């Protein structure tokens, strides 16, 4: 039996596409195992999917102070030995890194053991971890057309893996033709929520006359749901507030407009489904990945790029009042034209070509 080890940890942006690929490979008869950490979302999501998971304690190095950095270096060194043992025991025929710190020790130990390494770079810019591993990787797969940097001779644009139910949605022209009444807005803060969106949306909607307001579903993140419900109540705005959405295909199908961050997997889902969006990139001092993703979407006329520094209640209220279903449909069709609904199969085909019999 062919065997795949997936390396992914932390937030949904790394884990959900890994799970999508796991489903694809299992459907092809492969055995899939997972390398993650003890503290990320994968701790719950991966076992629930019936995938065996091994963990390391390494948790990244950047931006958390000298003490954390020193501790991180020591854990990184220890994790190399742990990864070597995991690979020896699992005997994968190919290793797939989904980006992020967990891929570094696992990737180098794959090289040491002679196991082919494939990297998925979800964003429009090359991730630091992938830059470090590119020299030893057989292939670097990109979610979007990009400056391939030092990966040019190994690069292949496959798109990012998304759930089959999202790719299978009706094209936007058909979906939007079925929509009527007030605009339906879906606000998605990601697996951890987005405080800037949680603050801006209730205030913006309060500035719109009640008879002109769109219908809103707002995903808050588990920690923020009580606070967000209180914000909407204080603003006198009716909204459906949920902590987590487990039926995203239906939510995308129902929405005229999505307001969200610009993570690579979110953008890939928006293009695969064909949904209009307002993208508010997360401000991170160490990377510009989300800004690059949002800029790319705006260039395709598939989204509105709204920098967080320009996110105000009045500005957002004006934007929403000037939005029409026809404008949303045009953005959605542009997004759909740039979607890769064959990404799962394209990535799977690469793995099939490189797998080493064990």
UniProtKB/Swiss-Prot annotation:
Family: Belongs to the glycosyltransferase 28 family. MurG subfamily.
Summary of the function given for this chain in its UniProt record: Cell wall formation. Catalyzes the transfer of a GlcNAc subunit on undecaprenyl-pyrophosphoryl-MurNAc-pentapeptide (lipid intermediate I) to form undecaprenyl-pyrophosphoryl-MurNAc-(pentapeptide)GlcNAc (lipid intermediate II).
Gene: murG
Stretches assigned to coiled coil: none
Domain of life where this protein originates: Bacteria
Alphabetized SUPFAM superfamilies for the sequence: UDP-Glycosyltransferase/glycogen phosphorylase
Keyword Cell cycle annotated: yes
Official protein name in the record: UDP-N-acetylglucosamine--N-acetylmuramyl-(pentapeptide) pyrophosphoryl-undecaprenol N-acetylglucosamine transferase
């Amino acid at each position: 039996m062919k065997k795949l080890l997936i390396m992914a940890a932390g937030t949904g942006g790394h884990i959900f596409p890994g799970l999508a690929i796991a489903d694809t490979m299992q459907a092809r008869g492969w055995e899939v195992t997972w390398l993650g950490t003890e503290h990320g979302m994968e701790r719950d999501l991966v076992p629930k999917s019936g995938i065996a998971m091994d963990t390391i304690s390494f948790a990244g190095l950047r931006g958390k102070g000298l003490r954390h950095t020193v501790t991180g270096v020591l854990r990184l060194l220890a994790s190399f030995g742990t990864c070597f043992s995991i690979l020896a025991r699992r005997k994968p025929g190919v290793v797939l890194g989904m980006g992020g710190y967990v891929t570094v020790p696992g990737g180098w130990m794959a090289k040491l053991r002679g196991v082919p390494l494939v990297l998925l770079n979800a964003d429009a810019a090359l991730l630091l971890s992938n830059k470090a591993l590119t020299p030893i990787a057989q292939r670097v797969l990109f979610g979007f057309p990009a400056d391939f940097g030092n990966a040019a001779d190994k690069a292949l644009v496959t798109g990012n893996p998304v759930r089959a139910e999202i790719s299978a949605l009706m094209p936007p022209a058909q979906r939007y033709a079925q929509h009527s009444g007030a605009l339906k807005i879906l606000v998605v803060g990601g697996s951890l929520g987005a405080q800037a969106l949680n603050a801006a949306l209730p205030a913006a909607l309060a500035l719109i006359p009640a008879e002109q307001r769109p219908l809103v579903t707002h995903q808050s993140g588990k920690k923020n749901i009580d606070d967000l419900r209180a914000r909407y109540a204080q603003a006198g705005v009716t909204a459906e507030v949920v902590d987590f959405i487990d039926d995203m295909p239906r939510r995308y199908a129902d929405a005229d407009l999505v307001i969200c961050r610009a993570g690579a997997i979110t953008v890939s889902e928006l293009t695969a489904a064909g949904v209009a969006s307002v993208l508010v990139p997360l401000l991170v001092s160490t990377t510009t990945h989300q800004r690059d993703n949002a800029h790319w979407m705006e260039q395709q006329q598939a989204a509105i790029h709204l920098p967080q520094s320009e996110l105000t209640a009045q500005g957002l209220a004006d934007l929403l009042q000037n939005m029409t279903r026809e404008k949303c449909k045009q953005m959605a069709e542009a997004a759909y034209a740039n979607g890769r609904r064959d990404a799962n199969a394209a990535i799977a085909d690469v793995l099939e070509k490189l797998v080493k019999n064990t």
